[in-house]
Regions:
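Carbohydrate transferase catalytic cores enriched for Leloir-type hexosyltransferases
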Residues: 1-330
């Protein structure tokens, strides 16, 4: 029996892609009869400030894990201890904070610039969600490729072509409201596209920064559960995701899984799973976004996207994680 310590702290703070990764991983791991899982959580920002979380709780986590006789400790985001006598796995979803520091608050910028090299050095293995993210970790954190494990994200059962669809005529955007997600340019591109009769529906949690969305033809839906999100994908004329930087881009894969045409930035990491399926645009150019939206709406349903997305499952991702844990515990 392998005893795994799993940091689930981010679930208290986010409902975005990181939360999807943690909840999907945890659900799969709990079905593994040969694993015993010890969850760790600092309890959310109401109980500890960001500074205390990063400077007190995480440094103490390996000692707690040793007392609990944990065989492997897995920190599910880049926030992790700087040293650990327990074999340590750290998931780095992306390095946006180093590539685009202006898109983050001051504490996150300062802490990440200082902490990430230490975290990368302490980790026995670093999990990344794409080959692009692997290259970023190697370049920016000087981590050798042999300590990096690429385990792509997956899609769960709700996201499939057949099933209930949301009513209405709309373009769907799934994104946290924060500067890096590039929503103002998406909205401008939507307005320029001239898609008569369609509204833009925005799904996602509040983020940070002065991101203003709204106006005629724009409807904010906030956070929805997975079943409702799948309904929205299936009912959409197209989905659009034009973030300026991602390690993976899970909404693109989820739209594909529902056979919904999807607009996405050209290049990496999207071309690792959406090449030839997504309608590629320049996310810095509203006219390019507008053209992509028009093409996607005209293109209709995309069964090839669903077939491509079927290669990416959370079950496969979970098994890859389990294999890594066993390797480190051996």
């Amino acid at each position: 029996m392998l005893r795994l310590g799993l940091d689930v702290s981010p679930l208290a703070l986010t409902k975005a892609g990181t939360a999807r990764y943690i909840t999907s991983l945890l659900a799969g791991l709990e079905r593994e009869s040969s694993l015993e899982i010890q969850r760790y959580s600092f309890g959310g920002s109401a109980r500890l400030t960001r500074v205390a979380r990063d400077t007190v709780w995480y440094p103490a986590l390996p000692r707690k894990a040793r007392r609990d006789q944990v065989d492997v400790l897995h920190c599910t985001t880049m926030r992790a201890p700087f040293r650990s006598r327990v074999p340590l796995v750290v998931t780095i979803h992306d390095l946006a904070v180093l590539r685009h520091p202006q898109a983050f608050n001051r504490w996150t910028r300062r802490y990440s610039a200082f902490a990430l090299p230490h975290v990368a050095s302490a980790a026995d293995a670093i999990v990344v969600v794409s080959e692009f993210a692997s290259d970023e970790v190697q370049e920016l954190l000087r981590v050798p490729a042999e300590r990096i494990r690429v385990i792509p994200n997956g899609v769960g059962p709700p996201f499939q072509p057949e099933g209930p669809r949301e009513d209405g005529s709309y373009v769907l955007a799934v994104s946290t409201l924060e500067p890096r997600k590039n929503l103002p340019r998406l909205i401008e591109g939507f307005r320029r596209a001239g898609l008569d009769g369609l509204e833009l529906r925005l799904v996602g949690d509040e983020g940070w920064g002065d991101v203003r969305v709204g106006g005629a033809g724009i409807r904010r839906l906030g956070v929805v559960d997975d079943e409702e999100l799948a309904r929205l994908y299936r009912g959409a004329a197209c989905a659009a995701y034009v973030s300026l930087y991602e390690g993976f881009g899970l909404p693109v894969l989820e739209a594909m899984a529902c056979a919904t045409p999807v607009v996405a930035p050209a290049g990496r990491p999207y071309n690792e799973f959406a090449r030839g399926v997504a309608f590629e645009v320049n996310p810095l150019d509203p006219d390019s976004i507008a053209q992509g939206l028009r093409q996607a709406v005209a293109g209709g349903r995309q069964p090839v996207g669903a077939r491509r997305a079927a290669d990416f499952s959370w079950d496969r991702a979970v098994q890859a994680h389990v294999a890594l844990y066993r390797e480190l515990a051996a």
